[in-house]
A protein has these predicted regions:
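A polyanion-binding, active-site-adjacent surface
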Residues: 2-182, 186-227
Length: 231
């Protein structure tokens, strides 16, 4: 078992946040088949593209135990990753939903998905303290992901969390501003940073984030990794 896998096992046993522990225990009483634990990261450990989300959805990855699995956000994300050649889900399944459960055979190619918070929070809003408790896991994870070239931050919390890591390790975050499609690339940065709206239903069902907009994000990521894109 390598260090990255060991870290994920450690994450699933975490009980640092009493509010979240109690919240998940209450959900588990009602839905006994739900995962209801911290959700580990998912993907290719040699990936060049790191995707950062916010937190598990109550009825998505909190239910299934795998990042972006079992809800509308996952359907939107994995459909786009398939179109980008970054996951193996066959087109004929129709992506309804794209990712059903942790044992459905889905595999990621050259991308790795993590999140700034590992437990489903009430109202999908982790507190600053809860984000801080998870941050050490993110720091360790990035250290172990040796091949990352491009970071795709899904939402402002993911974007700000990555900037916090930069401030600790590289530079001050002066000049960084979250906006969909913003790209930060510099010889002083360890990775190319691409900002995107989160594929939440609040964004996708209102048209704030369209499939075309999301495809453009991963088209850019592919271009920075390979020099070209098939999207």
């Amino acid at each position: 078992m390598n260090k990255l896998t060991q870290l994920q096992n450690q994450i699933t046993r975490c009980k640092k946040c009493p509010r979240l522990v109690n919240y998940l225990e209450e959900i588990k009483k009602k839905y006994r088949t739900y995962w209801c634990k911290p959700v580990p990261s998912f993907g290719d450990q040699n990936a060049e593209i790191l995707i950062i989300g916010l937190a598990p959805g109550r009825f998505g990855s909190n239910r299934t135990g795998r990042m972006f699995t079992g809800d509308a956000s996952g359907e939107f994300l994995y459909k786009t990753l398939f179109e980008a050649g970054l996951c193996n889900k066959p087109a004929e399944v129709g992506f309804k939903p794209a990712s059903v459960h942790a044992g459905d055979g889905l595999k990621l190619k050259n991308c790795y998905i993590t999140a700034m918070a590992r437990c489903a929070p009430p109202q999908n809003k982790p507190t600053p303290k809860e984000l801080e408790n998870c941050f050490s896991y993110f720091v360790e994870e990035v250290k172990l992901l040796k091949n990352v070239k491009v970071v795709v931050a899904l939402g402002k919390i993911a974007f700000d969390g990555y900037l916090k890591w930069l401030c600790n390790d590289v530079l001050q975050k002066k000049g960084f501003k979250f906006s969909h499609g913003a790209i930060y690339k510099s010889k002083d940065l360890p990775h190319i940073l691409i900002a995107s709206y989160h594929p939440s239903r609040q964004n996708t069902q209102t048209g704030r984030l369209t499939p075309k907009m999301f495809r453009q994000i991963f088209k850019k990521a592919l271009q920075y990794c390979y020099g070209t894109s098939n999207m």
